[in-house]
Every structure is written in structure tokens, then in C-alpha cells.
Amino acid sequence: MTATLRRDGALALVYLAATWLTAAVFMGDTLYYADSVLGMTGGRITPATFDPRGNYSFFEFGHLLWRPVGWLCYLAFGALARRLCGGDARQAAVFLLVALNWAAGLCCVLLLRRVLGYVARREWVIVTAAVGFTCAYAFLNFTQSGSSYVPALALYLAGLLVLLRGGERVTKPLRTALGAGVCFAGAVCLWFLYVWAVPAALAAPLVLFGDDVRRRRLFVYGALVSGGLTVLLYVGAVVGGLHLTQLAQVKAWVASSGHGLDNNRGVLQVVFGLARTFLSVGRDNVLFKRFLLHDPYNPVTAFDLVRLSLWKLALFYLAAGAAGLLLLGEGRGRRVLVLLLLGAGPVLLFAALWQGTPPERYLPLYPVAFMALACALDAERRRAPLKTVLLAFVLALVCVNAAALSTAALGRRQAAMSARTAELVPLLKSQSVVVEVKEELKDLQWEFPFHPLNRVLTVYSAVSIGDAESARWREAFARRATEAWAAGGDVWLSRRLLEPRPRAASYWVEGSDPGITWAQVNAFFGQFEQGQAVGDADGFVLLARTPRNENALRALVSSP
């Protein structure tokens, strides 16, 4: 067995152990993708299907090829997946999407090890950086989800490696550009945000190996191939798939990829979100919002943040500063620092303009970030304190994220949800709906899609903070409740809706949407007549189907 295979095998074992001992705590839009795959298979969705919110479009602007890839996978392996999932088609589709991500994640780790070899010489440095990458929060989480982020990252890393191999000594620039360009186009078509990271990858040979005519030619060829193929695929989807012929229709399609979200932008969101993509903060992001917005129900002090969360942010930015100082100390490091700025700058700018806190937003800068980490650790100058900070950061990546995503911790969360709904489940009809606001039951469906409760429990969040249509949350609830009644189901309300203040353990942050207050939510649900109650003080009450309740809900449904 060669040394390369031994090293690959060791990193593969690290990846296997990391994903065996942990699970995703945030699955993104996995269920939307699974439902789209099943809809396409069953004929309910066609390539021309356009959802104004982007959730069920077969060709979605932000993830153009992910649903088609999932659909083809389901056609090939759906029967086997259904047998493994007890005949549940939805869980089978989720299983296949997660399997694709897991395989892509393994490819990412092995590809990154080779990429790091171009900026670091010591094997222990390369392994340390690769282990840190494996355990970084966004990667470790989403490699176990059904979203497209990690497969896109794998293609991006493959394209970067092709360019570095062909760009060190340029002999066949067109062939190299074709290989890299196909990979980059695939990455962008799986997740459009990689478009902000591709220019840095194209420039990598010029930055790392020096400027010459052949590398400039490679840059131009790569840009033409990746850009041209991306445009060709998008035009094909718009014209041949969606059959959009007017500019206004195309604009609406592009806008639908925002999924109706309209806030969460700004520099502060980037400061928090960038650190969060590497180190899990759990629910600390809720505490951070409560502190910034001076939540009157669940106030958070600066001391609370320091004690619970800010040390992680401090460690991240301390490590970033240490890496910067080490990179500035030698010529190779300065070149890597330039590449880091080229790769991170556009990603950070876009995050400041739209949705800066989600951890997946920063996955496109992972390759250059860990290249910078490896190069800094590999620096020739002996600056032990700075390197100690970097090693402490890598250790924190392993320990903090392994604890946050551990299967044991997530199992306890699921057990608590099961216990809370134990008395409710036997009373649920197939069309019944359980209503809550910013609570954990919705997590059961979206973050733990294989949990057996998902086969009997349909959860509706009465208010979606940050949604462009959140101002009409009353009308949306009325519509959902009347639909459940018309289908023969019941509507159950979480008792937490009827409490005068949101619980500290909830996700509610007063002021995160200026147009919605807890007092409004509490007063709205408190006006309805109630029926049977189940469980303890943290249980559920039946929304009684009385003439008074029906009239109130019908009035809301018919309101303009």
C-alpha cells in the first residue's frame, strides 16, 4: 500500500468516525427536495413547474440541478431505498439525498488533502487542517443532510485541484480549463453562491505559482468554459424546462430562490455567521439576537454572551488574526493571503447583503480558508504562540462540534419531543395539524426526518419570522385550520401559545420582526374557544370547531 493510500485511508477513517458519532442538527431544505423528487416521479411536478417561493420548482435558480440529480438517483435506486426505509417513499428520497451528501463529503476530505499539498509541506500540518475541515460545523452538519451544499463543494474542490495540477507547469491549458470549467459549472448549478468563489479558484495558479502568459491563458480559458457552460445550462432550464419567455417571468423565477425571506442582513450578521460556520453555537444565535434587540421577555446580558457564546467568536477571530500574521511573514504565505482575500471577499459581501447568519452561506470559502490555515501552520518562522492559537482553534472545531452534533445529544432532544407528544399522538387523525410558534416540534419534521413521529405528526408554525408574508400570519393560520377541518382533521394548539410570555428555551426573539409581537400572538390564539386538553402544562389543547371559531376563521380567510 502506497503512502498516499495510507494517508487517504487514515483521513477516510476520521471522516467515517466523525459522521458515525454525529448527525445533522439542521437539514436545510431537504424535505422540499425529497417532495420535489417524489412529485416528479409521481407526475405531480414537471420540469415546467414553477413555485413562486422556490420550494417545489423542479428547476430552482439557486440549486438548478439538485432536484434533477436527486430524481435520477431515485429512479435508479428508489426501490432499494424504499425497502431500507420500510416502504416510506419520502424517507427513501431523503435517504438517497443524504447518501449523496455523505459520499460527496468523503470526496471533499480527500480532495482537500491534495489541494493542501500545494500550500503546505509538512504532512502533520496537512492532516491537522484536513481534520479541522472535517469537523468544521457547516461541513460536518450538511454532509449528513440532503441539501446540495456539500456536493457543490466537492465539485468546486475537484475543479480547484485540476487547476492547481495543470497550472503549476502549464502544458495543456485547454484540457485543464475544460476539466476545471465543467467542475465549476456543476458547482454553481448545484448552488449558485459558488459563483462568488469561482474567480478565486481560476486565479489560484496565477497567485500561487506566479504570473506568466500560459497561466493567464489558462485563467481565460477556464472562465470561458465555466461561464459558458453555466449560462448554457441555465438558459436550457429556462427555455427548455420552465418555458419562460418573458423577462418578468425570469426575474420572478430568480427572486423565488429567496424563499420569501426578506431580512437578516448586515455586517453584524456576517461577524456572527462567519464564526458560526466553523464553530457550533447551538442556540446561542438566539441569545445573540435577544441581546442586540433587548428582548423584554427573555433579556440577555453581555455577561451571558461571554459566558455562553462569545468565547467561541473570540477564539475564531483570534485564530484568524494569528493566521494572518503568520501568512504575512513569508512570501508563500502572502500569496495564500491574497488568494484568501479573493475567495472570501465576494462571499462575505454577498452575505452582508442577504442572509448573513446561516452557516452554509460560507461553505464556498472553506477551501481557501483551510488552505490559509495549513499554510500558516506550515510557516517556517518559529512563532509558537501564534501556532498554538491555531492548534487550539482546530481542537475546538473537533470538541465543540462533536459535542453539539453528537448522536447522544440529538437523541435526548428527540426523546423529549416524543415524551411531550405521547398523549397527543393517539388522538391525531390523518389530516390533523399541530400548531406552534418557533418551537422544537417543527424541528422534529425538518431536522429528524427519519423519526417515526413524522409519519403521524403534521406541525404548522403559526408565525414564520423573516418571511416576506409574515405580516399575514393570522390569515395564513386561518386558511390552514379551515383546510384541516374541511379534510376531516382537527387543529391542536400548543399550550405555549397561550402563555403570557415566550419560554426562554423557545426560538422566539421579541423584535426580530417589528410587525409581530408575542402579545399579538398570545391574544390571537387566546380568543378562540378550546376543547379537549392533553398532557401537562406543556401539552396541547384542541381548537374547538364551534360556530364562533368557524366564523372568525372564515372572516380572516376571506379578508383582502
Please tell me what each predicted stretch does:
Residues 1, 13, 291-334:
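Hydrophobic, aromatic-rich transmembrane alpha-helices
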Residues 11-15, 128-129, 224, 315-322, ...:
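Transmembrane alpha-helix segments characteristic
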Residues 129-130, 175-192, 202-203, 348:
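Membrane-interface alpha helices of multi-pass inner-membrane proteins
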Residues 138-151, 358-359:
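Short acidic/glycine- and proline-prone juxtamembrane loop motifs at membrane-interface regions
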Residues 165-169, 196-231, 235, 239, ...:
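Perimembrane helix-loop-helix junctions
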Residues 174, 182, 223-228, 332, ...:
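Signature aromatic-anchored transmembrane alpha helix within multi-pass, membrane-resident enzymes
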Residues 397-448, 456:
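Membrane-embedded, lumen/periplasm-facing catalytic core of multi-pass transferases
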Residues 429, 436-438, 450-549, 554-555:
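Luminal/periplasmic acceptor-recognition loop/helix of membrane-associated glycosyltransferases
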